[in-house]
Structures are given as structure tokens and as C-alpha cells.
Amino acid sequence: MDNPQPELPMPFPAQASDMPLLPARMVNEYQYCPRLAYLEWVQGEWADSSDTVDGRYRHRRVDKPGGTLPEPADEGDGERFHARSITLSSARLGLIARMDLVEGEGSVVTPVDYKRGKRPHVARGAYDPERVQLCVQGLILEEHGYRCEQGILYFAESRERVPVRFDEELRALTHNAISGLRFIAAGGQTPLPLEDSPKCPRCSLVGICLPDEVNFIRDEKIAPRPLAVARDDALPLYIQARGAKLSKKGETLEVSIDDQKIQTVRLI
């Protein structure tokens, strides 16, 4: 289970002068997994996966700046605008975000965040980490004088736009994630990994985080899960025999016991 215990709301402290601005993406990571956010934000760890590479490829268009974000206009004034790849920050909130797209008219704006993959069929239209990241963008836009009541998540593979309202519940969840990230960053102690979570196998930092290995050391009753294979066209090779030896010969792997070959496996 990820975290079955209820969470108490954290206070939203003022930004310390010596603390760097928190990127919206890191608030997303904290909501997804506090340990992942700590490894990336505090320790500077990073590893690519097929998902992250594909995500960058799909973002290549929206990452190119285009259009301008005008100053907030009076109600009913101003033309509709689209501004791409806009970076805004708030010193008061201690936040910074690069927004894929901001749509607006006058003082009313809507941030649009592009995501790879298809829209998930869940009650709120999207998972909390993505909703929180979008809400951070809305909070920053409000700090700059705009009215921002909702955002849009655009899922590239299914080509669907999912509206996300910035209601009080989502705002509270977002403030709690911001405070939680600041708390663990200031604490200097790596959070424990999730336990038996389906989030871990596809995480790009699973080889650095080692969730199952760390949990097994902490409690031997927690059995390690089978290896997660990054490629769906390949299979893992398990060798459990005592005294077995693995060697590579050309494009094959050979398994032997007492110098007697017992298995040959072709590499893909």
C-alpha cells in the first residue's frame, strides 16, 4: 500500500529567503512520491526512461516560445491570446513554473499542460499529481493579477482536453504538497520508499531508489517483487540455482553449473 493512513493538512509557511523556488514539476513529483521528489530536487538525481524520452519528444512543439502574455486587462477588455512556453514565478509563494500554453482573454486565463499518453478514466478526469501541478500554475498566474479558475490537461495520445477546476479542495491539496516538499527538503533525510506500489516499476529512478531492496533490508517479511522489464518485447532471465555461473558468448548468455552448460539464452 502507498500510504493508507490519513494525512493532516500542513501549514503553508512563508518562503525562506535562502530557499530556491520550487518548480511546479517537483510539486507534481512530491504528490506522486515524496522520495522521488527528494531524490530529484534535493540530491539532483536523474535517469531517463522510455517514458521521459517520449515525453520530451511530444513536448518539442509546445517547448518553443510563441505569442506573448499581456498584462491583465479590465473585465471585457482585450483580445483572446495564446502564449506558449511561458515561465512565471512568485517570490511570495516560492514557486516557479514553465507553462506549456496559457489561453486567455482580458484578465481571465487558463493554463494548458501537455501530457503524453491517454486520458485516464478516473473520477476527476486526471490523477492528483497532474492536477496539483496545474493548480500551481494557476496560483502563480493569480499572483500576477490574472483570474484563473481552471486549467486544462491535454493528453497527446488520445488528443483530449480535460478541464480541471481549481476548487478549494484542490487548492488545499496543492498547498499541502508544497509545504510537504519544503519540509522534506529542509529535513535533509531521504523519505522511505513506497511499499509494493504499482508506481515503482515504470518510475525512471527505480534503479536509483531501489524501493524493494530498501524495504527488504528494513523488513525481511516484505518479499522483493519480480524484476520490472522496461521493454514489452523482452523477458527477464532469472537464475536461482546454487553455484550457477552466467557468461556471455557472442549474442547469447550461457548458464552453467560446475562447468557444465545447462542453458543458452539469446540476447534481444
Give the role of each language-model region.
Residues M1-P111, K118-V122, V132, A223, ...:
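Metal-dependent nuclease catalytic cores that hydrolyze phosphodiester bonds in DNA/RNA
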Residues R61-K64, P72, C135, A172-L173, ...:
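Short, intrinsically disordered/low-complexity patches at protein termini
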Residues D2-P13, R92, R124-G125, I140-P226:
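Metal-dependent nuclease catalytic regions and adjoining charged, substrate-binding loops involved
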Residues V132-L139:
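Short amphipathic alpha-helical face segments that pack within enzyme cores
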Residues Y114-K118, F155-E157:
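Short, histidine-centered active-site or binding-site loop motifs used for metal coordination
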